Design a protein with these regions (language model features):
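Short, Lys/Arg-enriched N-terminal segments with co-localized hydrophobic residues
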Residues: 1-7
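Juxta-kinase regulatory segment immediately upstream of eukaryotic protein kinase catalytic domains
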Residues: 8-40
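ATP-binding pocket architecture of kinase catalytic cores
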Residues: 39-180
Length: 180
């Protein structure tokens, strides 16, 4: 992870020792379940706050894998299946999300649940004021961000199959109670 000006880079590098997994088993799974054939290179992104994230390369194709971290976890934490389900549901809308490729809940494959999605090029801005771009580009970035937020707010969660997602009620109250 490095920052240059206001743009943050999560450039991939070697897989950290604590996050290594059976890459051959992953390649077999992806060939069988998603038709991704050929040699598979795995690198780990330097950033990420909760779930280890990896760049998968197979020929000219690139994908992102997100998996649960190792160790003891809160039962309701690190639910990569939820991430997958939400983005898969949003793919039915005009909200821009990467194409979901596969969800694997069989821990025998790489030791934990994971999902794979397409890799999309982009930039991550560390400073919300985005000082290193022109005024015009900054305005376009803010307009695009606001457009996507508006699209998210227009999503009818029932129409995209998320009516049974989560527990109704006060989410924040439950979180405060859990961590206090």
């Amino acid at each position: 992870l490095y920052a240059r000006g206001s743009v943050m880079s999560f450039a991939p590098g070697p897989v950290r020792a604590a996050h290594k997994f059976n890459e051959a088993a992953l390649a077999d799974y992806l060939q069988r379940e998603a038709g991704i054939a050929g040699s598979l290179q795995v690198q780990q992104f330097g950033g990420g706050q909760s779930n280890p994230t990896f760049l998968l390369s197979s020929g000219a194709q690139r994908f992102v894998l997100r998996k649960k971290p190792p160790g003891q976890l809160l039962k309701s934490a690190h639910q990569v299946d939820r991430e997958f389900r939400i983005m898969k549901a949003l793919s039915q809308t005009d909200v821009p999300v990467p194409r979901m490729v596969a969800l694997c809940e069989d821990e025998s494959v790489i030791g934990t649940s994971f999902y794979v999605m397409e890799y999309l090029e982009g930039r991550i801005f560390r400073d919300p004021q985005v000082p290193d771009v022109s005024r015009e580009e900054r305005a376009a970035i803010y307009d695009s961000m606001n457009d996507v937020l508006a699209r998210l707010h227009r999503v009818d969660y029932r129409k995209v199959g998320l009516e049974d997602f989560g527990r109704p009620g006060n989410y924040f109250e439950r979180q405060i109670t859990r961590f206090i």
